[in-house]
């Protein structure tokens, strides 16, 4: 379907969990002839990342309120009003046919500005429990979409847009069929690393010995400390890296993943068709727990909460999963995945833009 001449503004910022799905949808629609601009903040990751993808970005000034001091709370209405005014000026200048909100603080003023300008707002919630901004915006949005069931009572479940190289991986039965030898355990801490994984996994390696081979991504600045921890328990055969540039290749190598359960990570693991042991980040909304729960319920993963995540517990779980079990879990993970999430979100964006065109034509 051609989007020739149609204009989209994507609002997303702060973290990769918001920005990467937005980029996936943006590229999909640009390939159909859409023009895309981005609304973000100048001091977060989108400021550098989005222009690298050939998308122009506009900035407004806004930051989060949770955990801020009394002066920040008192001045918040003024700052929000100013951010809405900035966003409205940008909307009037660019005149998008539709606005896609992917989360982050920028979506609040941006969504309100779009609504004030009569531009339809499509929202996408990546997590299993809705963020504050999206909960608020859902009341004025034309369409609300969710990656996992339960974030909103009536929203369509469309999954999270996932990178094409992960979607292109062979299905589990092809990938895992002829494997033998030690179980390949991929440990992913994210760009910042996860201290609980870095502290626990060397002990797990010592406990399980020759039964596993580990590829442990430790995060920024933790390489020498974690390497030393593996050496101290006589486990020097494992691969320890600070970052992983090619996650699709890492998923292809792995038999099982041990990681946090951020929304995008969970969606990628399902799309790849991989069993997982999740240790959710201890957030007051328990966001990561709710992200991981559908995979645990499907029999594709196990959740161990951080206070219970220790050498004995992790070793017991991993040693209980033989290759036949891992293949079954991998197939269950793939069955839960929504591999066409990008198409689904893009279709809803197109529909909302179409409804505005009809409305304007008949207005």
Curated annotation (Swiss-Prot):
Keyword field contains Ligase: no
Pfam family, one: Glyco_transf_28
The keyword Transferase belongs to this UniProt entry's keyword annotation: yes
Keywords associated with the record: Cell cycle, Cell division, Cell inner membrane, Cell membrane, Cell shape, Cell wall biogenesis/degradation, Glycosyltransferase, Membrane, Peptidoglycan synthesis, Transferase
Gene3D superfamilies reported in the protein's UniProt record: Glycogen Phosphorylase B
Binding-site residues for UDP-N-acetyl-alpha-D-glucosamine, renumbered to this chain: 15-17, 127, 163, 191, 244, 263-268, 288
GO biological process: carbohydrate metabolic process; cell division; cell wall organization; lipid glycosylation; peptidoglycan biosynthetic process; regulation of cell shape
Family matches, as InterPro entries: GlcNAc_MurG (IPR006009), Glyco_trans_28_C (IPR007235), GlycoTrans_28_N (IPR004276)
Function: Cell wall formation. Catalyzes the transfer of a GlcNAc subunit on undecaprenyl-pyrophosphoryl-MurNAc-pentapeptide (lipid intermediate I) to form undecaprenyl-pyrophosphoryl-MurNAc-(pentapeptide)GlcNAc (lipid intermediate II).
HAMAP family per record: MurG
Family, per entry: Belongs to the glycosyltransferase 28 family. MurG subfamily.
Protein name: UDP-N-acetylglucosamine--N-acetylmuramyl-(pentapeptide) pyrophosphoryl-undecaprenol N-acetylglucosamine transferase
């Amino acid at each position: 379907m051609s989007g020739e001449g149609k204009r989209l503004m994507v609002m997303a910022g702060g973290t990769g969990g918001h920005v990467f799905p937005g980029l996936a949808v943006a590229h999909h629609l640009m390939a159909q002839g859409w023009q895309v601009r981005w609304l973000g903040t100048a001091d977060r990751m989108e400021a550098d990342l989005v222009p690298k993808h050939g998308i122009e970005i506009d900035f407004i000034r806004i930051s989060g309120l949770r955990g801020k001091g009394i002066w920040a709370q008192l001045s918040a209405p003024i700052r929000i009003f100013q951010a809405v005014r900035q966003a409205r000026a940008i909307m009037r200048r660019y005149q998008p046919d539709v606005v896609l909100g992917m989360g982050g603080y920028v979506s609040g003023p941006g969504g309100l500005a779009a609504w004030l300008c009569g531009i339809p707002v499509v929202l996408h919630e990546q997590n299993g429990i809705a963020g504050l901004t999206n909960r608020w915006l859902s009341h004025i949005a034309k369409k609300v979409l969710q990656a996992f069931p339960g974030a909103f009572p009536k929203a369509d479940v469309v999954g999270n847009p996932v990178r094409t190289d992960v979607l292109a991986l062979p299905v589990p039965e092809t990938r895992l069929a002829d494997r033998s030898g030690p179980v390949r355990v991929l440990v992913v801490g994210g760009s910042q690393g996860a201290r609980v994984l870095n502290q626990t996994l060397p002990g797990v390696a010592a406990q399980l010995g020759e039964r596993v081979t580990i590829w442990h991504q430790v995060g920024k600045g933790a390489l020498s400390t974690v390497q030393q921890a593996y050496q101290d328990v006589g486990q020097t055969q494992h691969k320890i890296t600070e970052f992983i540039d090619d996650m699709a290749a890492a998923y292809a190598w792995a038999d099982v993943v041990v990681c946090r359960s951020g929304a995008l990570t969970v969606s990628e693991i399902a799309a790849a068709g991989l069993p997982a042991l999740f240790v959710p980040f201890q957030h007051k909304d328990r966001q990561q727990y709710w992200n991981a729960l559908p995979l645990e319920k499907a029999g594709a993963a196990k959740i161990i909460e951080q206070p219970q995540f220790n050498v004995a517990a992790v070793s017991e779980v991993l040693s209980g999963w033989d290759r036949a079990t891992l293949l079954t879990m991998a197939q269950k993970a793939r069955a839960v995945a929504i591999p066409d999430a990008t198409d689904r979100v893009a279709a809803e964006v197109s529909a909302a833009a179409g409804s505005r065109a009809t409305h304007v034509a008949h207005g």
